[in-house]
């Protein structure tokens, strides 16, 4: 397995990355990108901690070598519970900011492993064996992965093949004996500027007319024609003022494919349009299981910072404070419970994969996304205005203002101004900074929008069974 430095060195590969209007020749030297890289590198450091090693590392069933547990194919509810614990634990170790180096990539691997079997059975293709060879390659080289799933979409009323601009959805523009050439753009691709490999999956169900848009593959990030435009990020934040986002961030980007060649051995769907929807839905379920798993530590942080603020302010037992904290506990435990239920009530597929319960994954993800803003409101209510108006670290060090801050911003007896400000800065960074803004939007739309979850819940739940129950009860037809 690689270490952090080997991961960082692997990013000096000539990839075409842009940020803040400039092409970055060496992303490891750019301050904004380097912050995300250092955050990602934690994935290659945590296994060195003795207390985490047994959880993070396992043996490959193919080679017997040590591998990251992310590459373990879940075969049972116990395996899924361990995957949940893995994501939860690594997120908590990284200040409740999920790493996203292998989570999304292995979500894609698990989805492809399930759906490609069905494609092969219908068409006699060899996609499943290609997926397993790629899986082994990623595992043996300990590579990081990004998932490029969401297309630019253009006019949402129209199918991919009906768009005025034909590349709003990634499209196969040429088929060759040795592979295909693709053109288009994927958006919101988390970590694509700083990972080794790109998984590309369809974002929606397709019609036969959308055959050229029904494509799935995996390629290196530095493949010629791949151009990445990162969202803006600051690399110069003071840790006192930004206790989370000074050191932790995940970068999202536009990932553009300008006539990119994909060899046959890396293609996992190529025109089998009727399987695009099942693959998109299968990936969404795996990814929402990941979402439930990484959101729980953040919800615990909400509880902890709220209780600490209340204590520092001298009102830990005030009834309205206790009401808000109880609401946060309910929110957190709903997330945890649906994650565990999705694992324990999993579906074992024909090829032996333990598939998280789709209905419960979608309900869990819907609850954490729809409740996030209300929960952060509770944190902000408890904290008051100081997270937004408090002085900076520079003010706390300035001889002209230091003593004044210490005199007036202390809390209850025994709580000094600096300790109180540190907690307030955490509240601010959770709910009122650029980094917090990413969380506000990302929690709603990451792993799919609220409407996407509603559609999945409606599809998965057997309403007819409930209707039949009422008919039987009333003895009506």
Predicted regions and their residues:
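Acidic/polar, glycine-rich intrinsically disordered N-terminal extensions of enzymes
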Residues: 1-60
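Generic structural signal for well-ordered, non-transmembrane alpha-helical segments
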Residues: 34, 38, 136-139, 297-300, ...
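A structural signal for well-ordered alpha-helices, especially hydrophobic packing surfaces
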Residues: 41-44, 310, 332, 336-339, ...
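Glycine-rich flavin
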Residues: 58-197, 203-217, 222, 227
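FAD-binding core of flavoproteins
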Residues: 147, 152-293, 458-477
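Extended amphipathic alpha-helical segments enriched in small hydrophobics
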Residues: 290-349
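Short, charged, amphipathic alpha-helical segments
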Residues: 322-326, 354-362
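Alpha-helix capping/hinge segments and adjacent helical runs
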Residues: 359-477
